[in-house]
Amino acid sequence: MPPGRWHAARSAQVSREQGCLRMVKEEEEDGYISMQTARPQTLNRPGQELFRQLFRQLRYHESSGPLETLSRLQELCRWWMRPDVLSKAQMLELLVLEQFLSILPGELRTWVQLHCPESGAEVVALLEELQRDLDGTPLKDPCLTQNPDVHWIGTSALQPAQIWSPASHLKNSSALEDHLETSHGIGICDVLAEQTDSPAVSVPDYFQLEEGIEYQEALTFQDVEVTFSQEEWGCLNSAQRNLYRDVILENYGNVVSVVGSSPKPALISWLEARKPWGVNICTVQLKRDADAAPEGGKLQIKPNKFILKQKPSEYIEACVKTSVSPETSVSEETGLKESFKQKSRLQTSCGDSIQMKEMKEGADISQRTGRESEVLRNNDILELKHVKCVSVSRKRLSFKHGYDRNFRKSSHHYNNKYGEGLRGTGEGFGVYQNTGLKENGKDRYGETSRKSWHAHPEHRQPSYSEEGLFQCRVCGKAFKWRSNRIRHEKIHTGVKPYQCSLCEKAFQRLSSYRLHQKTHSKQKRGSSKYKNALTCSLDVSHHLTDRDERKHLHCNQCGKNFSCKSYAIEHQRIHTQEKPYKCTRCRKTFRWKSNFSRHMKLHHKEVYKQEKRQEDFKQSYRQSQVISTVEKTFPCQNCGKTFTQKKSLIEHQRIHTGEKPYQCSGCGETFTYRSSYIIHMKRTQHAIKIKPEHGCLTFSQGAVFPIPRGSHNTEGSNKCKYCGKAFHNRSFLLIHERVHTREKPYQCRECEKAFRWSSNLYRHQRKHFLHKRYKYRESKETSNLQSKILIDQKPFWCQECGKTFTRKRSLLDHKGIHSGERRFKCNLCEKSFDRNYRLVNHQRIHTTEQPQWRDKDFVGIHARSVDQRKHSNTLQSEYGLHSDKPGLSYCQDVRLNIQELSGKLRKECDNPSDESSKSIAFQNVPTKKKACHKCSTCGKTFKKHSHLISHKRCHTKERPFKCIVCGKTFRWSSNLTRHMKNHVRN
C-alpha cells in the first residue's frame, strides 16, 4: 500500500483486529515470490464510496471501446456492491441510500454524510432528530437556486468547474451551526480541521473558512486523497492499482494547477518513483498496547514502542527518497495528530553512520500499506543501532525467511524492557523480523507462546497457521511444511522458471523438465545444447549433475536409459524372459535374486524342521533304548531274543515249537497268531454262498455250516436293482449304480468335463496342472514339437520313441524297454522280466498249472470266480506267513492252493451220480458275461460302452484325433500315437 493517510473506518479496523491474513512479499536476490491473501470478508465504507463515484462518473470516451467500458463498469459495480459480502437486500439498500442522499438539499446531504449512515433508516433518524432540535422548522436547501449541489472530490480527475466556490453561504447558518455536531462530541470545525476518520472522500473546509482567506485555500490535496485498507489493497490486481495511480496523479495535477505549487506529498513522490505493487515499503510500526482505548476515544500512547521492520540502510534510503520537506507528520487511525521535531542518528548494518535531517510536520512515515503511525508525545532523539551485520548466503535463507519466529528470553536477541528483536538501545528501538509476539509474550492470535527457540537460523520454529498447518493464501489448501506451500503457490502465480533451450517449452517443476529433456536426449545425445538447456531467472544450473550425462546404456526394445551396466542387464531379463537363478532342490527358476533368496529361505525352514524332527526322533530313540535295556527281562532260550512282556515271549516261542492254536471251523486251517486267524475268518465270509432251501451257508469246497441269520439280511438289503449284484456297504452300491444310470457327478471346474469316478477327475485335473506348469517353461533340450506334446493330454513323454503316457509310473515302466532293465525277478529260477504280467505268466511253469476246458466253461486260474480268488488269498496268507518252504513266493503259494482246490472240483464234477455236488461245483464256475451294449446300425454287441463308441466311428467316419503339428486327423488314438513318432524322429 503506498504511503498516505489512513481513514479510521470501523469495519476495516475490526477486520484487522480479527487477524486477517496479510499479504507477504518475499524479496530474494534473484527475484521475489508474491503471496496474496483471499478477499477480505469485511466492508470498508470509504473504499465503497470511492468505487461508487468511479462507477457514476465513468464516461464512454474514457475507454477504448464498448467491451472495455462494460467490463470496467462491471468491475467497479462489483467493488461498490460487494456481492461476495452483502446480500441482495443490503445491495438494494445501498441503491436506495444513494438515491435518497442525492435528492437531499446540499446542506443536509453534507451534514448527513459526515455521520456515515449505512442505511436509509439511519438517515431518516438523523433528519428527524435534527428537525426536532430546530423546533419543527422544516429544512430547505438555500443553494438550490443559487449554487449547484456540492461535488465530492477525490475520485476522478478534477475539473476547474468542480471546485467548491466559497461565495455560497448557507442560510440560517447560525441556527444550524449549533446543532451540526458529530456523534463523537467533536465540533464541526474541529472535525473538519483534524478529522482523519472521515469517509474516503473528504468534505471541503467550508465551515472553517474566514472572510479574509483567499479562494485557493479552500482546497488541498488531502481533500481529494483516497486510501485503502491493507486488506482491500491486497485484493486489488495490477489493472486496478494502475487505475488508482493514474487517478491520484491526475487529481494532484489538477490541484496544483488550481491552488498553486505546494510541498509534494510523500504519496505522490512514491507513486512517481516506483510502481505501488512491486516493492516493499519502508515500515515503522507502532506497537499498540493492550490498554488502548476503544474506537472513537483517546488512545493512551506509551513511548518507546516503535519497532523498525526493515534494515536501517533500507530505511534510510526510503526516508531520503520520500521525505522532501523537513516537516514530518505521523498520525494514528483515531484522528489524533501532534507535531514533533526529532533528530535521528542512524547507523547502517555495516558500521557507516548517517545523520538524518530533522523530521518535521508535513511528510509521512507509514507502513507498506500506507497506514499512518501514531504521533510521539515526546521529543526524544530517535536513535537506531543495528547490532550486527548479518550476511545471508544463497544456500541459507532461513534468517531472511524466518518469519513468525519466537526468540528465547535468555538470548541476547531478546530484551524484555524494550521489546523483541535485537538488543535494545537507550531510546527503546529494536530491529526485529516480524516475530509476531507482543510485549506480554503473546502471539498475534492472542495465545501465549509456550515454546521458545534460539534466534539462530538452525533453531527456528516453523510458522504454523491457526490450524497448525501452512495454508495456501490463494485456495486455502493446507501443507505440513512451508517449502511445500511455496512450491504449491507457484501453480497460482503461473511462473515457469525451467525453460528448454531447444524447443523453448517452459515447466514449473524440475522433475517435469528432466522428463522433457529425455525426448531430446534420444535424438541429440551428447549435444552441447543439452547441458545449457536449463535457462531460468533463478540460478538452478547446479540441478543438472553428471549423473544425467552418464546414462549412456540404452535399451533397444523399450528405450530406457541406465547409468549402470548391472541395471541394464537386469532390465533385459524382462524382455528375454530369462531366469538365471535356479533352485537345486525343486528346480524352480527365478528372474530376480530377491525372489530366489526368499524361495531358498523356505527350503531352509523345511530343512531345519526336518533336522529338528530327526534330532527329536534320535533323542526319543535313545531314551527308548535306555528304557528297553532296563525293561527287557524275558529272554528267549532258543534264539536269545528278549521281550518286555511275557505275552510277547509266548507268541514268539510258537515259531520254534510250531504250535498253531487257532483253527478255522469251516476249513480246519490252523494259525499261529490270532491276527492271522481273524483275517482268515473275514475273507472266508466272502467265499460263502447262501443256500435258500436249507437256510445254510455253503462253502466253495462243498462244506455246509450254519451262520448267523443277520448276514443274509445284511447282504440282501444292498442289492442292485438293475443287475442283482449285492454289496455289504450301501456306498459301494451307490457307486456301482452309476454304471447303469450313466451319472457323472464329478465335474472339472476349468473345462466343465464330467466324470463318473473321483479318481478319473483327479487324473484329469493333473493334466490342467501340468499344462500350466509346462506352458511357459520350454526345456532347452526339447523342441517346440516336444513341448507341445508335453502340453497335450498325456504330459509324460518318452524322449526315445515319442510315446506319451498319462502317468509317470507308466513312463518309468516303458523306459525299461529302452534301457534293458529287468526289475521283475523270479525267486525260484532267478529269471528277470521287464513287465510284471510276464513274470506272472512265467510263474505258471513252476506251479505246473494246466488250464482245462469243459464244454464252454473254462476251469482254471484264469476262470476262477471272485469267491475262489478271495478264498485262495486267505489260504495263501496263512501258508505264506508260516510255511517252512522259504523258496515259494506269494504268487506261487496262491497257485498251489488253487491247484488243489481245482483238483477237488474236477473230481466232484467227474462223478455223475452226485447231482447235488455237480450243481454245487458248477455253481461257482462263472459263465460268459452277456454283452449289453448293442450297435443300432449293424446290431453288433459290446461289453463296454467305450467299445461301442469306438465302433460307431466306422459308421460315422468321425476322426476326433488330430495332429497338432500337421493337422492330420485319425480315427483311433493308437494311429495318432504312431503318427507322432514320425514327427519326433524327423
Swiss-Prot record:
Entry superkingdom: Eukaryota
Sequence ranges assigned to domain SCAN box in this UniProt record: 52-134
Pfam families found in the cross-reference section: KRAB (PF01352), SCAN (PF02023), zf-C2H2 (PF00096)
GO-annotated biological processes: epigenetic programing of female pronucleus; negative regulation of gene expression via chromosomal CpG island methylation; regulation of DNA-templated transcription
Compositionally biased spans, kind Basic and acidic residues: 439-460
InterPro entries, per the entry: KRAB, KRAB_dom_sf, SCAN_dom, SCAN_sf, Zinc_finger, Znf_C2H2_sf, Znf_C2H2_type
Every KRAB domain range: 219-289
SMART domains: KRAB, SCAN, ZnF_C2H2
Similarity field: Belongs to the krueppel C2H2-type zinc-finger protein family.
Protein known as: Zinc finger protein 445
Organism for this UniProt entry: Mus musculus (Mouse)
